[in-house]
């Protein structure tokens, strides 16, 4: 399998995993209980409770990352060429960048630009050597909006 086919396949699979994770997070967002409502107490965070809202989000982030890594490694291993040190290094870089992006809060265009610059991610969308790994991330402050069009979406390209 040539490199272009590998890149294309890995790109679409990763894109789908992250997109599905975001959809899950939006659809299963628990309702907030007001602190001031009488008769209702907010329980402290329980690390053993898998259905606690923070815990649930965290688990699904980890699952999405792990699935992505597994898929990408499978594509590398399916190739007849032996897994070189360079390819392993590339995989590690992608993995680290993915983890950073999922936990990162990006609010404004200015912050977005600084974040791209800091992590040495591509701002040039036309070059083929840049692979769209993540697709879309919805910042926290837009999760309340009903229409997806109003939300501030951006695409991330990782050098491969």
From Swiss-Prot:
GO cellular component: plastid
Keyword terms of this UniProt record: Plastid
Localisation per UniProt entry: Plastid
Protein name: Uncharacterized 20.0 kDa protein in rps12-trnP intergenic region
Organism: Euglena longa
